[in-house]
């Protein structure tokens, strides 16, 4: 795998994940209590023995840069690296990234200097575990110019993805990005060609691109240089290339979830608490998901009732009830609280007991969840200060609302409390 260079696309402004992306790049969004989204593709690369990794981003890169610098510091004796390349304006190109392909094109001058055979293009907002070695091996065996990782998919979600048709050899012969209506119907195929049973094929009659590609180095350089107006892999580069290049499909048959929206992100996090087997586990001895070592103390539970939940390290919980929830590192929950079906991202720092008491004495609200508060079906971003006897329950069953001045948004019926927000005592949302 020394001849492979990985390029992780950090995505655009993250509007679908807003307000979680208000103060951070999409790959830096916390997930599963202690990780960040970027940890997933980077860990997959490391476990696949791919150690040359670039992350392309253009919005709010500071926390992403900090996380990567603290986490993925390879020894000076190896040529491995994880490096963030932020969008930049130059005299030759005064524009920001215009799309996924344009992001790679703008750094092509640097990427093409590497002595590699393939470029592996990955997305920064997917939850999955994959051995890219098998993917690249298939690419080489079929002498493909481009190989796409694909999954079979059902009618309900098909129009959200790039869909394709393949021949018996696995070659892509038609590709359509997010088709609707009649165009969608035309992309139905017999997915038994991927190895599905007739029953599975009947319920999943489409072949969807996961947004994970491997290109021959010279093919990618040629495609990007000869068509400067094409800015997106899924919409333009791949459909056009499938007409006159050997574009192959590689079936990925394990758990994979695109968590680029608030609802999908919320559901994927809470699914980690499912019994008896969650659809995805961050623990795998053979292929761990890495993140920054924080050296926090174990979590302290004082007379708490906790069911079907994940609790990060360094938390302090007092006489509360936690059900079907995920609590991030350094979460602090006071007496009498009820947390149900919620994702709490925790805090970036501890407040000492003396400091907390001083805050309370001055009438300020300390970081964490105050006494007798009820939180249900919500996402609480980092460092939120939630007061005494607050109810975050979406009492009016609102589906969408922008209340930034009050410290929260509602997306798909899920209340999202902003990072560093202050919710005063007695507030009912």
Swiss-Prot record:
Any Pfam family matching the protein: NTP_transferase
Enzyme Commission number: 2.7.7.27
InterPro entries: ADP-Glc_PPase (IPR011831), ADP_Glu_pyroP_CS (IPR005836), GlgC_bac (IPR023049), NTP_transferase_dom (IPR005835), Nucleotide-diphossugar_trans (IPR029044), Trimer_LpxA-like_sf (IPR011004)
Subunit structure, as described in the record: Homotetramer.
Name recorded for this polypeptide: Glucose-1-phosphate adenylyltransferase
Catalysed transformations (reactions): alpha-D-glucose 1-phosphate + ATP + H(+) = ADP-alpha-D-glucose + diphosphate
Main EC class the enzyme belongs to: transferase
Any one Gene Ontology BP term: glycogen biosynthetic process
Alphabetical keyword list: ATP-binding, Carbohydrate metabolism, Glycogen biosynthesis, Glycogen metabolism, Nucleotide-binding, Nucleotidyltransferase, Transferase
CDD domains attached to this UniProt entry: ADP_Glucose_PP (cd02508), LbH_G1P_AT_C (cd04651)
Function text: Involved in the biosynthesis of ADP-glucose, a building block required for the elongation reactions to produce glycogen. Catalyzes the reaction between ATP and alpha-D-glucose 1-phosphate (G1P) to produce pyrophosphate and ADP-Glc.
TM stretches of this protein: none
NCBIfam families documented for this protein: glgC, PRK02862.1
Domain of life from the UniProt record: Bacteria
UniProt binding sites for alpha-D-glucose 1-phosphate: 162, 177-178, 209
Molecular function as annotated in GO: ATP binding; glucose-1-phosphate adenylyltransferase activity; structural constituent of carboxysome shell
Pathway per the UniProt entry: Glycan biosynthesis; glycogen biosynthesis
Family statement drawn from the similarity comment of this UniProt entry: Belongs to the bacterial/plant glucose-1-phosphate adenylyltransferase family.
HAMAP family per UniProt: GlgC
One Gene Ontology CC term in the entry: carboxysome
Source organism of this protein record: Trichormus variabilis (strain ATCC 29413 / PCC 7937)
């Amino acid at each position: 795998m020394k001849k492979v260079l990985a390029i992780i696309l950090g995505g655009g402004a993250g509007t679908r994940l807003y307000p979680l992306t208000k103060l951070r790049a999409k790959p830096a969004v916390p997930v599963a209590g202690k990780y960040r989204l970027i940890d997933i593709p980077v860990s997959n690369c490391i476990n696949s023995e791919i150690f040359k990794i670039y992350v392309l981003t253009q919005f709010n890169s500071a926390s992403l840069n900090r996380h990567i610098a603290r986490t993925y510091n390879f020894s000076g004796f190896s040529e491995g690296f994880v490096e963030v390349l932020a969008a930049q304006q130059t005299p030759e190109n005064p524009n920001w990234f215009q799309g996924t392909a344009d992001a790679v094109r703008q750094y092509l001058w640097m990427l093409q200097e590497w002595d590699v055979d393939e470029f592996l293009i990955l997305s920064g907002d997917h939850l999955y575990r994959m051995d890219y070695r098998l993917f690249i091996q298939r690419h080489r065996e079929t002498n493909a110019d481009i190989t796409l990782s694909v999954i079979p998919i059902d009618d309900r979600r098909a129009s959200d993805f790039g869909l394709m048709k393949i021949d018996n050899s696995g070659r892509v012969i038609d590709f359509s990005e997010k088709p609707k209506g009649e165009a969608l119907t035309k992309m139905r195929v017999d997915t038994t060609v991927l190895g599905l049973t007739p029953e599975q094929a009947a319920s999943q009659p489409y072949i969807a691109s996961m947004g994970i590609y491997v290109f021959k180095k010279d093919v990618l350089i040629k495609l990007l240089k000869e068509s400067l107006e094409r800015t997106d892999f899924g919409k333009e580069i791949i459909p056009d290339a499938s007409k006159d290049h050997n574009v192959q499909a590689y079936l990925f048959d394990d758990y994979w979830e695109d968590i680029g929206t608030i609802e999908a992100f919320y559901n994927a996090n809470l699914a980690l608490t499912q019994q008896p087997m969650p659809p995805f586990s961050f623990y795998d001895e053979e292929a761990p998901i890495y993140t920054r070592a924080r050296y926090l103390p174990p979590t302290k539970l004082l007379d708490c009732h906790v069911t079907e939940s994940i609790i990060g390290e360094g938390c302090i919980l007092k006489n509360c009830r936690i059900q079907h929830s995920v609590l991030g590192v350094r979460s602090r929950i006071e007496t009498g609280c009820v947390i149900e079906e919620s994702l709490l991202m925790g805090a970036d720092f501890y407040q000492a007991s003396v400091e907390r008491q001083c805050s309370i004495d001055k009438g300020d609200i300390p970081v964490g969840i105050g006494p007798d508060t009820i939180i249900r079906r919500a996402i609480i971003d980092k460092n939120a200060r939630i007061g005494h006897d607050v109810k975050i329950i979406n009492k009016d069953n609102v589906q969408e609302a922008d209340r930034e001045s009050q410290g929260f948004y509602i997306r798909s019926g899920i209340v999202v409390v902003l990072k560093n927000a202050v919710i005063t005592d007695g507030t009912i949302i």
